[in-house]
């Protein structure tokens, strides 16, 4: 589960770089949406780990 947290964090950071720096140009809006989706996934993963639901791998 912690592995997924780091994966979501990495994907959120990559999406942030693409979306907020202007590198993506026309796709900046899409990158921002993806950033928020992965950020939400990261937060949900953290909540599950804190609550002790470690069997969420399925």
From Swiss-Prot:
It is a multi-pass membrane protein. This is UPF0391 membrane protein VP0082. HAMAP family: UPF0391 (MF_01361). Pfam families: DUF1328 (PF07043). Its main location: membrane. Keywords: Cell membrane, Membrane, Transmembrane, Transmembrane helix. GO terms for cellular component: plasma membrane. It comes from the Bacteria. The keyword 4Fe-4S does not apply. It is found in: Cell membrane. Belongs to the UPF0391 family. It comes from Vibrio parahaemolyticus serotype O3:K6 (strain RIMD 2210633). InterPro entries: DUF1328. The chain crosses the membrane at residues 4-24, 30-50.
